[in-house]
């Protein structure tokens, strides 16, 4: 209790969030508990909550004794945690008994459901509650929360708790099982680049015996999902909605507020007793704009803008306008995912729509400059997003280089960036980068679409050859590749030939013999390359020559190649240790 840091769960916003109540509704009960000597309050630094000290609540000795006297029947039943993936903390929900019963019954029967509703209507809370009921019945929950960089592989990895297969059918098989439910939340956040692949994943999952629940904002980007039943949730009934509001405002006023806001849970959390009762029939988005955003200070709006324009949730430490984080948290504007934070999507969407385009571009430009000073692939991904939306002239060479770097760690994010870039500037080099990335991701259909949009050139022929090879048409691939090599400069032809040989060896199914012959490697004429490229080209060919010799069992070739590699890399190079295994 004397520690400098306190967890957010002990702060007033954290307590209100867990109880499913508006912030003002917990003031009176807390005062009564404190007056009874059951709790104490103090100011402390909240972990991940910004630099300002905030009120936190602790049980006193008497409070602990009272809590221990509670019978087991009075305590909420705890299920054994059977969740895999980033499942959010459970909060208490009100007035959803009918929806809960329906979802539970259908998932227990192995049904596939698409849960839709307006932003902030309570889809995640309802989904989390039904997950708890399933776990109480011994079900394993595989949970994925989507963002703009999520693809089928990322969803599979979240649900499995480890690296996922790439193929949709293989993922569906891996996540299915007896007494298992698959939950995919925030599906509307998926980028159009990955929508088709995730649609295929959901369709594959629908063919298994495992129940699937996809929670998505209406209208769903999937439209109608084959094999899925759509369940749409509405606002709370007035009798349930008033339970979210503080008792101090009186039952008549509470009913007026609940009816005016259509029983919308998030809107009710955002309303303050210090404000007038909203106009009946006022759209929730209009209420957010005219009331919630208007009452924020410049500090609060500055932090909200930074969070709203970011492509991903941020930690408080990553914010460069962090002064307003406490105000936003106190106003129930934020949703927390452990150490990361973002605005509730309803508020984010309204803020994005209301910020003047020129101001938004300026904010993106400033954010890009700040992120450019930070290290790491996450920084490059966020910087690239801001540069794309800044309205500044796009440096396509810089973007292509960074996309290639980002793809080494997160090819899904790289695919989103290159797709967004092409929407802004349909540059030939960006298209070629998109084609190469699609090949690396095992998406020949995406590569084919981009190839059709590229003008005729040797580079296009090389990629058409690769597409033909992936489709198993080796004769056509050889023909296209030779045509491309004949059109390239001598040095570029050598580079392309080396790359083609490496891909021909790598792009094959496990267990299939290599199609590369030692004689093909020996035919590459390195003398056509500039001296600056000789060392790297020679090393690439020797590594390929060694891999081919391993398969053919040529002991003499292996010995000769190893000697060459030692001369180029040194006897102590770690790659040699791997080669010798």
Label the predicted regions.
Residues 56-61, 67, 126, 284-285, ...:
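Short capping/hinge segments at domain boundaries that bridge a core fold to an adjacent linker or tail
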Residues 75-103:
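Conserved adenine-nucleotide phosphate-binding loops and their immediately adjacent elements
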Residues 96-99, 125, 196-256, 260-270:
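Alpha-helical sensor/transducer elements of the RecA-like P-loop NTPase core
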Residues 116-141, 218-219, 323-326:
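P-loop NTPase Walker A phosphate-binding motif
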Residues 128, 135-179:
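Conserved phosphate-binding/catalytic loops and adjacent sensor/switch elements of nucleotide-binding enzymes
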Residues 174-195:
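Conserved P-loop NTPase "ATPase switch" module shared by AAA+ and STAND
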Residues 247-290, 298-302, 309-312, 321, ...:
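Amphipathic alpha-helical "lid/sensor" segments that cap RecA-like P-loop NTPase cores
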Residues 361-457:
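Extended alpha-helical scaffolding segments used for macromolecular assembly and cargo binding
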């Amino acid at each position: 209790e004397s520690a400098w840091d306190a967890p957010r769960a002990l702060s007033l916003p954290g307590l209100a969030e867990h109880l499913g109540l508006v912030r003002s509704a917990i003031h009176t009960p807390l005062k009564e508990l404190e007056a009874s000597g059951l709790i104490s309050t103090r100011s402390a630094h909240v972990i991940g909550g910004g630099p300002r000290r905030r009120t936190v609540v602790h049980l006193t000795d008497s409070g602990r004794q009272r809590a221990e006297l509670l019978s087991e029947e009075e305590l909420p039943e705890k299920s054994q945690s059977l969740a895999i993936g980033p499942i959010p903390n459970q909060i208490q929900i009100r007035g959803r008994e009918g929806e809960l019963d329906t979802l539970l019954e259908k998932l227990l029967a192995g049904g596939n459901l698409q849960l839709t509703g307006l932003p902030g209507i309570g889809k995640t809370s309802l989904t989390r509650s039904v997950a708890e009921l399933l776990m109480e019945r011994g079900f394993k929950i595989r949970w994925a929360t989507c963002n703009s960089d999520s693809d089928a592989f990322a969803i599979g990895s979240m649900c499995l708790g480890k690296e996922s297969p790439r193929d949709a059918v293989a993922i569906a098989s891996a996540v299915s099982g007896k007494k298992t439910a698959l939950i995919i939340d925030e599906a509307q956040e998926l980028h159009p680049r990955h929508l088709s692949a995730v649609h295929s994943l959901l369709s594959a999952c629908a063919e298994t015996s495992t129940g699937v629940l996809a929670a998505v904002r209406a209208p769903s980007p999937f439209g109608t999902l084959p094999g899925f039943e759509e369940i749409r949730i509405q606002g709370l009934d007035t009798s349930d909605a008033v339970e979210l509001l503080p008792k101090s405002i009186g039952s008549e006023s509470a009913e007026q507020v609940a009816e005016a806001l259509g029983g919308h849970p998030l809107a009710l959390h955002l309303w303050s007793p210090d404000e007038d009762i909203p106009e009946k029939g006022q759209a929730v988005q209009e209420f957010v704009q005219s009331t919630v955003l208007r009452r924020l200070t410049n500090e609060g709006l500055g932090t909200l803008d930074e969070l709203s324009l970011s492509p991903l949730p941020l930690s408080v430490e990553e914010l460069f306008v962090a002064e307003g984080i406490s105000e936003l948290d106190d106003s129930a504007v934020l949703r927390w995912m452990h150490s990361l934070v973002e605005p509730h999507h309803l508020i984010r969407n309204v803020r994005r729509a209301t910020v003047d385009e020129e101001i938004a571009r300026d904010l993106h430009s400033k954010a890009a400059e700040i992120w450019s000073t930070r290290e790491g692939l996450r920084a490059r991904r966020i910087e690239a997003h801001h540069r794309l939306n800044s309205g500044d002239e796009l440096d396509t060479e810089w973007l292509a280089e960074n996309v290639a770097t980002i793809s080494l760690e997160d090819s899904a994010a790289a695919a989103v960036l290159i797709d967004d870039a092409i929407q802004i500037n349909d540059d030939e080099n960006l298209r070629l980068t998109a084609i190469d990335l699609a090949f690396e991701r095992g998406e020949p259909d995406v590569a084919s679409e981009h190839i059709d949009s590229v003008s005729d050139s040797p580079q296009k022929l090389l990629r058409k050859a690769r597409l033909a090879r992936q489709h198993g048409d080796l004769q056509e691939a050889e023909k296209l590749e030779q045509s491309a090599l004949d059109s390239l400069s001598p040095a570029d032809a050598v580079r392309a030939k080396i790359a083609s040989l490496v891909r021909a060896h790598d792009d094959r199914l496990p267990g299939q013999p290599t199609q590369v012959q030692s004689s093909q490697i020996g035919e590459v004429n390195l003398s056509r390359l500039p001296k600056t490229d000789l060392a790297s080209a020679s090393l690439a060919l020797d590594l390929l020559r060694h891999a081919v010799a391993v398969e053919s069992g040529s002991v003499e070739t292996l010995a000769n190649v190893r000697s060459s590699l030692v001369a180029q890399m040194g006897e102590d190079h770690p790659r040699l240790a791997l080669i010798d295994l």
